[in-house]
């Protein structure tokens, strides 16, 4: 059974017309984007963004927010830290398509072992990680060095 949230704190709503070659916007108008299919997916590689880019930004922002909160609670200096999120899409052996994600932390003011621990804890706190756990491959790393996790 999926985990259930106990209280809805915020709801985002978006409308897309035209799928991957269309246009998307949020109900509050803060995001209003054209969508294009990358050439690697036999698209026209137009000037618009795509769902994978939007997912990468959303996941990285959410994950880093979780990490920053944990770092503050442990009195670690996360100033200047960055999360790089890489999202890949491809065919599944069983049919359809799937995603894979890699999250890499660059934290110049945090010791390597502390940074690894932050990545593991953020992975447990981040809503994107909780939503995708067990469904897609997520690779965690610090400065390109893998962080083993379940």
Predicted regions and their residues:
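Extended beta-strand/beta-hairpin segments
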Residues: 1-57, 64-150
């Amino acid at each position: 059974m999926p985990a259930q949230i106990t209280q809805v704190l915020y709801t985002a709503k978006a409308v897309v017309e035209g799928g991957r070659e269309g246009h998307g916007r949020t109900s509050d108008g803060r995001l209003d984007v054209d969508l294009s299919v990358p050439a690697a997916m036999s698209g026209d590689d137009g000037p618009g963004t795509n769902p994978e880019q939007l997912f990468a930004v959303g996941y990285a922002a959410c994950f880093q927010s979780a990490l920053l909160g944990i770092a503050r609670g442990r009195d670690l200096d996360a100033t200047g830290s960055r999360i790089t999120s890489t999202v890949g899409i491809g065919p599944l052996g069983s049919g359809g398509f799937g995603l894979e994600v890699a999250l890499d932390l660059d934290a110049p003011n945090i010791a390597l072992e502390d940074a690894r621990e932050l990545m593991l804890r953020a992975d447990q706190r981040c809503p994107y990680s909780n939503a995708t756990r067990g469904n897609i491959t997520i690779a965690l790393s610090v400065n390109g060095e893998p962080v083993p996790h379940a």
